[in-house]
Amino acid sequence: YIDAETMHLHHDKHHQTYVNNANAALEKHPEIGEDLEALLADVESIPADIRQALINNGGGHLNHALFWELMTPEKTAPSAELAAAIDATFGSFEEFQAAFTAAATTRFGSGWAWLVVNKEGKLEVTSTANQDTPISEGKKPILGL
């Protein structure tokens, strides 16, 4: 459970600030385009003067956008395909939950816990600091907290 005040703070304040700051950085280099996923998948391609701003704020935007997209008022189950992949990777849904909970609760300071598809196409639980995104590590996030 996440209370309404915390949700409001993250949606209307934090996320909006990430969007505003990412847009301000992108305005300095219109030649690189606005595809944050592509840019953050290859951070070395981002001009040095805006690189950290895009890592921080672009990552914050993408992380929160996925978080909002996945949020539902009702409890939902993973698709049959994802459930099978979770069982194959972790042994059971309960073992996945334990790994995901550990990734979330052992993150020192602020950050995210993730279920990602790694470069080898396999599921993996990982954690990133602050607003770092697994996209920058060549991973596709499918669940984030």
From Swiss-Prot:
Superkingdom of the organism of origin: Bacteria
Annotated spans, Disordered: 126-145
Gene3D superfamilies linked: Fe,Mn superoxide dismutase (SOD) domain (1.10.287.990), Iron/manganese superoxide dismutase, C-terminal domain (3.55.40.20)
Residues noted as binding Fe(3+) in the record, renumbered to the chain: 10, 64
UniProt xrefs under Pfam families: Sod_Fe_C (PF02777), Sod_Fe_N (PF00081)
Enzyme type, top EC level: oxidoreductase
One of the record's GO molecular function terms: superoxide dismutase activity
Keyword set includes Oxidoreductase: yes
Keyword line: Iron, Manganese, Metal-binding, Oxidoreductase
UniProt similarity note: Belongs to the iron/manganese superoxide dismutase family.
Name of protein: Superoxide dismutase [Mn/Fe]
Organism name: Streptococcus mitis
Gene designation: sodA
